[in-house]
């Protein structure tokens, strides 16, 4: 039907190969989801993320921030498909067993979503449901690999 | 904007071009991943057959699950960021109201673009294929029913719904055991509880008709047993929790008793389901854990029921003199040890359920695009033949530059989180291939000036109007219900 609508633009015919140039692009605000508060001196809480490539990142954050907010505020690979409302499993994290018991127990709605998480472990939680507090200062969490199960060795 | 220049090189950036067919969660998450992760500049176009975006998020997700639709915020941020003609590395366009294969051929996209990704979901219905399924009043497929109450322009004003006598619907049968079947059960059994529905974006036209139905009894009918139910715990829990409105769930003890299931043989999700059902089936005061005693039933007791019914095969839909459904004939099934299913069609095993409404919820079926056979694109039963998202020809070779993601890649299974994961994995492969591939030697653009379509800006206008209408009606959104209204929504503001 629309064959006649195809138009060849002659000026473009000369370019035959792609040059992969990396131009100085504007910084994309799209990549910065969260807006994290800066902790007051003396009130910083620490959290360490173990990324999918095994590298570690430690941040100083405020009490009350969720792990999802912290991860997105620092452009880590964590999605919050439902906007942090405990209606999906995309912010699944694996908590260091040393810290797991210090967390308040998950509610039914969180467990219902964890049922559907990839690579579920005994210490899996949703990042949107964990708020930073003094009880878990220094917490370590791993982002799950999608293609294999994460186990406790990832923390050693 | 009426001219979409597919190949965009105006600002000294050579962008490789990617077209995605379908703007539901799989299409949009694929676009999002490409725009976020590609090391080389891309010009991504999403093609959508409706004038408005978001597919099953807008027209499939239940109206009382607004949090599931929050993925639309991610898609919107992504579209806004890359639609503006600034010095962005990547560029994004949305083209709505155009069906690939109709106004524009798939072949044209393949000739024009460095990569084409098919993310158009599953657009057909699986059928029972029994007498009475077609042409009987009060028999609908889940896709039709869900699209109707969600205000899809193909169904919102369909006479099969609007002319149906809802005031006679007391007993309902739903065939199927997935989350869609549970969504429909919830809509029907709580139809007269305004606090659940009136502020949602459910079609007001549908809600007003649904409210007339004095629904008392909904049976969810499955061919297999409790172990094989496909729904997830969240949706099942929502049904049990309706007991505070006097709505009670039932399962016959011959299909469910806690002792039937050895926990060591099943996974965590299933064992949690067993606990949930065994607790909720007990009288309120006899339950052991406080999370099953959140809200007691009303003092007047229960007056509406939903029931999980197992091991039945529907045989025939029976009509009254006016062509409306009045009952469903079924037989018992036997589940053999090798998991094969055996319908027992002898007289002793045949029964009849009186039903006033029947919804078949057997899953959505993937449908090949019209050009597939001509282009030798492979199709396996209900999804596109592919290897890790790279589409295969009908003889099993890789079809160059063509990909599939989401339900049309794997079949209609999984929640948005799994669709997202699938989209990301396919997106990674597209990037891998684009980084090493040469560009097309011929560069074309597709002139849309003679084809009616919508842009992202048009959708923003429609969206604004729907939200405004919603505000006036005390709803989160009031959708335009016909194509005419949608196209008119583009005008003004």
Curated annotation (Swiss-Prot), chain B:
Enumerate the SUPFAM superfamilies for this protein: Nucleotide-binding domain
Its recorded reaction(s) are: 2 reduced [adrenodoxin] + NADP(+) + H(+) = 2 oxidized [adrenodoxin] + NADPH
Highest taxon in the source lineage: Eukaryota
Q: Where does this protein hold NADP(+)? A: 177-180, 223-224, 235, 414
Q: Name one Pfam family in it.
A: NAD_binding_8
InterPro entries membership: FAD/NAD-bd_sf, Ferredox_Rdtase, Ferredox_Rdtase_adrenod
The entry's FAD-binding residues are 26, 48, 56, 100, 407, 414-416
EC no. given is 1.18.1.6
- Tagged with keyword Flavoprotein: yes
Which residue spans adopt a coiled-coil conformation according to this UniProt entry?
Answer: none
Question: How would you classify this enzyme at the top EC level?
Answer: oxidoreductase
Q: What happens when the gene is disrupted?
A: Lethality in aerobic growth conditions and also during fermentation.
The way it spans or sits in the membrane comes to:
Peripheral membrane protein
Keyword field: Electron transport, FAD, Flavoprotein, Membrane, Mitochondrion, Mitochondrion inner membrane, NADP, Oxidoreductase, Transit peptide, Transport
List GO terms (cellular component aspect): mitochondrial inner membrane; mitochondrion
Q: What else is known?
A: Present with 1600 molecules/cell in log phase SD medium.
Its function, per the record, reads: Adrenodoxin reductase transfers electrons from NADPH to adrenodoxin, which is involved in heme A biosynthesis and in iron-sulfur cluster assembly. Involved in the electron transfer to heme A synthase COX15, a heme protein that catalyzes the conversion of heme O to heme A. Required for the de novo synthesis of Fe-S clusters on iron sulfur cluster assembly protein ISU1. Involved in electron delivery for Fe-S cluster synthesis. Essential for coenzyme Q biosynthesis. May be involved in the electron transfer required for the hydroxylation reaction performed by COQ6.
Output this protein's name: Probable NADPH:adrenodoxin oxidoreductase, mitochondrial
The major lineage groups are: Eukaryota, Fungi, Dikarya, Ascomycota, Saccharomycotina
Q: Which gene encodes it?
A: ARH1
